[in-house]
Each structure stands twice: as C-alpha cells, then as structure tokens.
Amino acid sequence: LLSNNIIPDLVITFDPHPSRVIRWFGDLQLNEKSIKKDDYFARQDLEIMFNNELKMNSKIIKLFNKFSKKIKIAIGTSSSKKVVKRLMSTQADLYWWNPLLDDPKMNNSVSKKIYKINKLPMINTGGNVGATAWMLADALFNCKKIAMIGMDFAYYLDTPIKSTQYYDRLKKFTKEEDLKLFYTKIYNPNLKKFFYTDHVYAWYKKCMME
C-alpha cells in the first residue's frame, strides 16, 4: 500500500515471532547472516517480492520511515521486542491492547492477570491478525460491510508443501513422510475448485465461522 502512496486507516499487529513480523515494518538489523538462519521469506508464497530480502527490507524501511507519522497502529502487548522497539522509534500513533489468551472468568486466567497489570482492553483475536481486523471492524467501528482480502486459509493445489506457512515448524517434530497428514484437500463451492489447507488454517476458519 505505502509503495502506492496509500495510507491504511489502521494497521494491526500482535504476532510474537521474534524475527519475522519486524520485516513488515523494516528490520534495521537485517543482514545475510540472519537471513540464512530463517528461510521463511525465501520459501513462502505470500509475497514473491520478499525473495530479494535485503533489497525489499531496505525499501520497507524507507517507506515506513517516510509515512509513519500518518499511520495508526493497534499493537498487541504480545508483540516482539523488535517490533515494539521499531514502532516506538517512529512517529506512528500506537494504540495498545491485550490479546485474549483464555477465559477471563476463570480463577487462574492469564488474560485477567495481564489486564490487572496494564489495564489495557482485551480483544479476541481469532488466532490471526486478519480475524482481529474483522472483529475490530465489526465490534469497535461498527462497519456494516466488511471485505476480507487475502484471507484464503488455504493453498492452491500446485503450491509446494515447503512453501506453506507452518512447514518449518512441522519439520521439527514430524517425519518427512508424515508431513502430508497435516494437510487436507478442500472444495470451494463458490469458485468450484479444489484447494488444500493445513490444520492451523482450518482452525482459523472454524474460529471465523463461529
């Protein structure tokens, strides 16, 4: 959006990953060594421009620095230290909130304990930032029509398994021959086409439907 001079009304972030999410705001410490440690952006199919990682990161740093004073960000307290440090060093307006981690009515609720410390509002995220955006648009901003773009929760059939979102994590505790058990074929009646999904995306969809 920023590369086309489009300023979003609100940016949402809360993913705690220590090194990946920062890339959407520009990682000031990114180098060849850190890239070799994590092949996520090299193998994923979400944005092919990220394949040239150093060049794209440099572009994002410049774009975000240029437009940050016009950007409002709803930042979850679960965000990584890198993201927090980066955003607080810019001119972006930050609006803090707590991701709902469990039922706050429970006696030993972690969400309740965190709220007592910082007194920030709690939001049911649905497990991903797209669902969070939908919930904010619906419950907070009372939007009557909400369009969801890029929330496929699935992959095209010709997408290599190694390009899927959670492949690297699966490899750590699953044998190569058993990886296929984590994926399932699904049918989209609107597009009249088959796709495939993984158990995490399937859970995200279930949460959205509920």
Predicted regions and their residues:
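Metal-ion/cofactor- or nucleotide/acyl-coenzyme-handling active-site neighborhoods
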Residues: 2-210
